[in-house]
Design a protein with these regions (language model features):
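Transmembrane alpha-helices and adjacent helix-loop boundaries
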Residues: 1-223
Length: 223
């Protein structure tokens, strides 16, 4: 038993930094890039949903319906394994960024749309009474208020995305879960390695949660 515990402790220590390195080099950048691009897509999609132009509104609804109605893992498989059949071959990391970006764009667009819609119509009317155009009203009056409403759910989405990046292992991205599988193949200790990965994800998520709480307090002071 003592030899077993020593071996497990040795594996834990030796694997911790390779896993942490994978998290810092692949998992965190994948999360940040996907969320950044996803927010841009989400904002445009939300505006399209709120648009009076029926074609834009319908296209945005269709996009959100497709992404929210299909599993993220299937979407990643279509991008990485499916597109080569029509001559489009993408790097695994790029495929993951595209897949997660589309997912963030669809889900976060609903958050942004709801935040914008929550601002009273009187705000629009007051800004237009001051001679502002619709675009100026959106940028100067509506969006600053909508951001405060959207921050908490968007922060939750960011934390969820961090955990969802483990799915990228299925398309060979060398993030933490993929590295843990490689180490497991050598050590035959899946329980230890997967618990270790879960611990690192928990550390990352806890840091983000504390950051989120501080941001919410900061924004609450300015309401």
């Amino acid at each position: 038993m003592d030899d077993k515990m020593v071996r497990l402790a040795d594996i834990f220590v030796q694997s911790f930094f390779p896993l942490l390195k994978a998290g810092l080099i692949f998992t965190i950048p994948l999360t940040v890039l996907s969320f950044t691009f996803g927010l841009a897509v989400a904002f445009l999609t939300a505006l399209a949903r709120l648009s009076n132009i029926r074609l834009l509104s319908t296209a945005a609804k269709f996009y959100v319906w497709i992404i929210r109605g299909t599993p993220l893992l299937v979407q990643l498989f279509i991008i990485f394994f499916g597109l080569p059949s029509i001559g489009i071959t993408l790097d695994a990391f790029i495929s993951a960024v595209i897949g997660f970006t589309l997912s963030v764009g669809a889900y976060s667009s609903e958050i942004i749309r709801s935040a914008i819609s929550s601002i009273s119509r009187g705000q629009w009317e007051a800004s237009q009474a001051l001679g502002m155009s619709k675009a100026q009203s959106m940028l100067r009056i509506i969006l600053p208020q909508a951001v405060r409403v959207a921050i908490p759910p968007l922060a939750n989405s960011f934390i969820s995305l961090l955990k969802d990046t483990s799915l990228a292992a299925a398309i060979t991205v060398s993030e933490m879960f993929q590295i843990s599988q490689q180490i497991t193949a050598r050590t035959y200790e899946p329980l230890l390695l997967y618990v270790e990965v879960a611990l690192i994800y928990l550390i990352f998520s806890s840091i983000l949660s504390m950051t989120q709480s501080r941001m919410e307090i900061k924004f609450a002071r300015h309401v």
